[in-house]
From Swiss-Prot:
It comes from Klebsiella pneumoniae (strain 342). This is Altronate oxidoreductase. Belongs to the mannitol dehydrogenase family. UxaB subfamily. GO terms for molecular function: mannitol-1-phosphate 5-dehydrogenase activity; tagaturonate reductase activity. The gene is uxaB. NAD(+) binds at residues 18-29.
Amino acid sequence: MKTLNRRDFPGAQYPDRIIQFGEGNFLRAFVDWQIDLLNEHTDLNAGIVVVRPIATDFPPSLSTQDGLYTTIIRGLNEQGEAVSDARLIRSVNREISAYADFDAFLRLAHNPEMRFVFSNTTEAGISYHAGDRFDDAPPVSYPAKLTRLLFERYQHFAGAADKGWVIIPCELIDYNGEALQALVLRYAAEWQLPQAFIRWLTSANTFCSTLVDRIVTGYPRDEVAALEAQTGYKDAFLDTAEHFYLFVIQGPASLAAELRLDKLPLNVRIVDDIKPYKERKVAILNGAHTALVPVAFLAGIDTVGEAMNDAEICAFVEKAIYDEIIPVLDLPRDELESFASAVTGRFRNPYIKHQLLSIALNGMTKYRTRILPQLLAGQQKSGQLPPRLTFALAALIAFYRGEREGERYPVQDDAEWLARYQTLWARHRDRQMSTRELVTAVLSVEAHWEQDLSQIPGLVEQVTADLDAILSRGMRDAVQPLC
């Protein structure tokens, strides 16, 4: 069986117009997959040069397959049918290492056709590295590398206003474009680069903040033989992802036409502010996950998919989303409901086995950031505590007992919470502490909740009643009235 390469598998090729920092699975099944669709169906005509931003030879370079690789997109489509779609991605031209070939890296700035910069250098990538110098070949941090590359372009084109770039980071941090621009400006000032360059940075270049959403499951190790038998070639860079994707870019309206989104309506939104979209994702997608985990796990279920195929647990989650989360969010209801419907479809994806215990990691912080704002907003709006979001808090406290049907399971959180729960549950077991006292002890940790939740009218009472029901009757019986 042949390995992918352009000689044996000839096809479309596109001129270099995009620089991409990062060669990982996510960008390849998200950004590059979208660019490939735009290249095929519009006149975008933009090839990608991947820059490996760190000094490592693993995994091997995409250039070993001439930039070619296959994405397998699978999950439930909008009609709820299971679909699996293989696509040979032809839009990546080559990969270069900023470390092994620094000159080739700088030469990317000399190409007049270069227009876009995408990146995913992990959450830690957009950060300041004190030791980075202008003369380093290359500097360590991604923002310093980008500053050096932008200065190379500025010099090569003598500060031409039409040679700036549209810079679209995909790292999972808030307002990633603004954070990246601030660091680029910091390096420019520290390196004492000319004021004219700093003016060009802000006037000729556009830094966009983004929200990215797609579960990318990467190289399908267990299925490679079967998948390669279907495609008819060997592919060391096979990349799998779910059917759903959403790309929200905070940038000028003109970007839609420049990316040819007017000619192929992908699920890409060019918006003035990503904040409501971020809040929607955190509240609905992440919030539903966090509410689901302790309830489903203590009901004897191990994966998200199984939970969504369980009529009662599914009803609990859907009612939490539609009756308690959506009413307090700040976007049109129909838009929120369509997003929620996509979310529950994603949870049912038969191709992804999402273990509840792995999502349970750091559950206390997740509850505070993902669910608590909606619980408090709901209580303020109606004067009533949202029953399912409150029950999810009781379920979370029960989860930290670390025991299901008499069997222990690992609980992962910061050491302080683990120690606190160990003490509280031991005292409760020895009847030195009532359920109400245990609940009060958890809700009054101001350093965590950023307020004393035990002072919220009725919250201690309701969480105590729910927790007592879970402990005395079991999760199935306790959750039933809320399904």
